From Swiss-Prot:
The gene is ctaA. Keywords: Cell membrane, Disulfide bond, Heme biosynthesis, Iron, Membrane, Metal-binding, Oxidoreductase, Transmembrane, Transmembrane helix. Pfam families: COX15-CtaA. It comes from the Bacteria. This is Heme A synthase. Heme b binds at H212, H274. It is found in: Cell membrane. Disulfide bonds join C35-C42, C188-C194.
Length: 298
């Protein structure tokens, strides 16, 4: 059922991952001004002549983002028509279109007008939401027609806790993006200490970096608690158990790559993996929230 939609959704999801990674590469290599202050053209040209590597990185990101923007809109319309009988479809379709447009506008605005570090950090957060909505739309296509799609009965306290962790994860994503855009990635040059101190001066780049460390550590603890709670009370829900196990694996890997960024001097591959893993973690949490919303908590 919906074979073509599944294939297209899968391709769009993969494409969104590529866009997200390209965006991380633009930030890491400081290629955001690779096309000057012109958009959508590059230095006023459709095809820039004798482009520098920063120009290639930035302009290829624009081209792929534009293509994926069109694909997301097509996916949203397609899913709306074929999966409108599923409760989450219309909400996800609307969110997918809104956030991909918002993401594009933020990117264009950053080039033409320049933006504060706070707004630039938001761009990555919006990218994570865009990826999640596309993946969830694709997931709905795969779930449709199955006899027992995940519908869970859980306590209100558990559901509230998961929602809080979900929101907190997004906040941690934002703090990480803020660290990148404020050039605070290596403000603490060692680990677990920060420049030889357990608690450094909490101001400027060092303060931003240290705050992100603490926030990431707390996220790890919260997700481990969520997994233990799930195993103790809801082990009969396989979808809930395995997604929480995946979350803990992802957050542990994310934590390890964060440490590696410091110890390797912000090596490119490690930094890219750090951005990718947290986006997959957020998408997984979005799926958990979606299946928890299908039944009222008791």
């Amino acid at each position: 059922m919906h074979r073509s939609l599944k294939i297209f959704g899968t391709l769009t999801s993969i494409g969104m991952v590529i866009v997200l990674m390209q965006g991380a590469l633009v930030t890491k290599t400081e290629s955001g001004e690779g096309c000057g202050a012109t958009w959508p053209l590059c230095f006023g040209e459709v095809i820039p002549t004798n482009p520098a590597i920063e120009t290639i990185i930035e302009y290829s990101h624009r081209i792929v983002s534009g293509l994926l923007g069109a694909m997301v809109i097509i996916l949203a319309i397609w899913a709306w028509r074929k999966l409108s009988h599923i409760r989450e479809t219309k909400v996800m379709a609307i969110l997918a279109v809104l956030f991909i447009i918002f993401q594009g506008l933020l990117g264009a605005g950053a080039v033409v007008f320049g933006q504060s570090h706070a707004i630039l950090a938001l761009h990555f957060g919006i990218s994570a939401i865009s990826l999640a909505t596309v993946v969830l739309l694709t997931t709905l296509a795969f779930e449709d027609g199955k006899p027992n799609p995940p519908a869970l009965i859980v306590k209100k306290g558990y559901k509230g806790y998961i929602l809080a962790v979900f929101a907190y994860c997004y906040a941690v994503i934002y703090t990480g993006a803020y660290v990148k855009h404020t050039q605070a990635t290596l403000a603490c040059g060692d680990f677990p200490l920060c420049n030889g101190q357990w608690i450094p001066m909490l101001s400027g780049p060092v303060g931003a970096h240290f705050f992100h460390r603490v926030a990431g550590t707390l996220l790890l603890i919260l997700l481990v608690v969520a997994l233990i709670w799930t195993l103790r009370k809801y082990s009969h829900y396989r979808s809930l158990v395995w997604t929480h196990i995946l979350c803990v694996i992802l957050v542990l890997t994310q934590y390890a790559t964060g440490i590696s960024i410091v110890l390797t001097g912000n090596e490119l591959f490690v930094a890219m993996m750090h951005a990718l893993i947290v986006s997959i973690l957020f998408t997984t949490l979005c799926y958990i929230v979606m299946i928890l919303s299908r039944n009222k908590a008791v």
